[in-house]
Design a protein with these regions (language model features):
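HIT superfamily nucleotide-processing domains
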Residues: 1-149
Length: 149
């Protein structure tokens, strides 16, 4: 693991050893305002237990993260904060954009023209070959259950 629970800023927030502006909390998750928001109202939802990557989460603990994000999303829309839509984003690894190595889901208020977006490759519009898709699906199925380590 790149960051131990001891040195992890999100774990420090869970233990109330670092400041945060809390939005919601339950037995498994904690939601708080992102200190470097992409848009006003940007919230992070984390599991209270340290897990660097989503695949490190114990069985059954990913669901509460999405449930918390769903509740935050609903509240953002009703809050009066500018929010025409909501992006849910989870970066899983450095190359995916993960900066804090404690699994977390971004709940980001969105509106037309906010300047945020997912950049896609120029060839994104092509339709993939079914045989290639079937081969990729088979590789992923074969890897199910194997550890990341």
């Amino acid at each position: 693991m790149a960051a131990s629970a001891e040195g992890c800023i999100f774990c420090k927030i869970v233990r109330r050893e670092a400041p945060a502006s809390f939005v919601r909390e339950d037995a498994f998750t904690l939601a708080f305002m992102d200190i470097q928001p992409m848009n006003t109202g940007h919230v992070l939802v984390i599991p209270k237990a340290h897990a660097e990557y989503v695949e490190d989460l114990p069985a059954g603990s990913a669901g509460p993260i999405l449930e918390a994000a769903k509740e935050v999303s609903r509240a953002l829309r009703a809050s009066g904060i500018r929010c025409e839509a909501v992006s849910l984003y989870l970066a899983n690894g450095k190359e995916a954009g993960q900066e804090v190595f404690h699994t977390h889901m971004h709940v980001i208020p969105r509106w037309r023209g906010d300047g945020l977006g997912l950049r896609v490759r120029a060839d994104r519009g092509r339709v993939a070959d079914r045989k290639d898709l079937d081969n990729l699906a088979a590789k992923i199925r074969a890897a199910m259950g194997r550890s990341r380590k």
